[in-house]
Swiss-Prot record:
Organism field: Xenopus laevis
Gene: cmpk1
Binding site for a ribonucleoside 5'-phosphate: R39, K61, I62, V63, G93, F94, P95, R96, R140, R151
Gene Ontology CC terms: cytoplasm; nucleus
Residues that, per the record, bind ATP: G13, A14, G15, K16, G17, T18, R134, K179
Record text on subunit structure and interactions: Monomer.
Chain positions covered by the region annotation LID: 133-143
UniProt keyword annotations, A-Z: ATP-binding, Cytoplasm, Kinase, Nucleotide-binding, Nucleus, Pyrimidine biosynthesis, Transferase
Cofactor note: Binds 1 Mg(2+) ion per monomer.
Protein name according to UniProt: UMP-CMP kinase
GO BP annotations listed: 'de novo' pyrimidine nucleobase biosynthetic process; CDP biosynthetic process; UDP biosynthetic process
EC number: 2.7.4.14, 2.7.4.6
Record family assignment: Belongs to the adenylate kinase family. UMP-CMP kinase subfamily.
Length: 193
């Protein structure tokens, strides 16, 4: 059985991770965060990609697509090998640019089906405030204002066009993510129910 994928996109701090946790609990999806996979890989002492990933993340740049896709593919294969019923995936924070999208379509064409893009739409200032708040406890090196402003620029220049492209294909489900966690999840449930 092929993996069934929902891409979860939105700016930094739009609530992707928080909402994904709830979708997992209620709908039995497996949540794969491209960012978390990259951060975990970066920490592995024997990783072939570790230092490369570190330098990209530190500079607020997008990691080369081959690395991200190979980590996503490996994670999906492992999950499905462990439990054949676990074939529904939320992929959060990917594809983040044109290169990501082309890489996915080149590598995963026929190997996975994308149902839709779940787009958490949130204004920049709300996103920044949430990230600064999260940064106090998360220990994430990129949750500081300077890094965040770069990440938001990268998002607007690179990821928004991907969302627009999926919109043209009729594959975007948009949620106003500036509301409270519960209000946002109510809207999310309307999409998944």
């Amino acid at each position: 059985m092929k993996p069934l994928v929902v891409f979860v996109l939105g700016g930094p701090g739009a609530g992707k991770g928080t909402q994904c946790e709830r979708i997992v609990q209620k709908y039995g999806y497996t949540h794969l965060s491209a960012g978390d996979l990259l951060r975990d890989e970066r920490k592995k002492p024997d990783s072939q990609y570790g230092e490369l990933i570190e330098s990209y993340i530190r500079d607020g740049k997008i990691v080369p697509v081959e690395i991200t896709i190979s980590l996503l593919q490996r994670a999906m294969e492992r999950t499905m090998a462990f439990d054949a019923n676990k074939h529904k995936f939320l992929i959060d924070g990917f594809p983040r640019n044109e290169d990501n999208l082309q890489g996915w379509e080149r590598t995963m064409n026929g190997k996975a089906d994308v149902s839709f893009v779940l787009f958490f739409d949130c204004d920049n200032e709300t996103c920044i405030e949430r990230c600064l708040e999260r940064g106090k406890s998360s220990g994430r090196s990129d949750d500081n204002r300077e890094s965040l402003e770069k990440r938001i620029q990268t998002y607007l220049q690179s990821t928004r066009p991907i969302i627009d492209l999926y919109e043209k294909r009729g594959k975007v489900r948009k949620v106003d993510a500036s509301k409270s966690v519960d209000e946002v999840f109510t809207k999310v449930q309307n999409i998944f129910d």
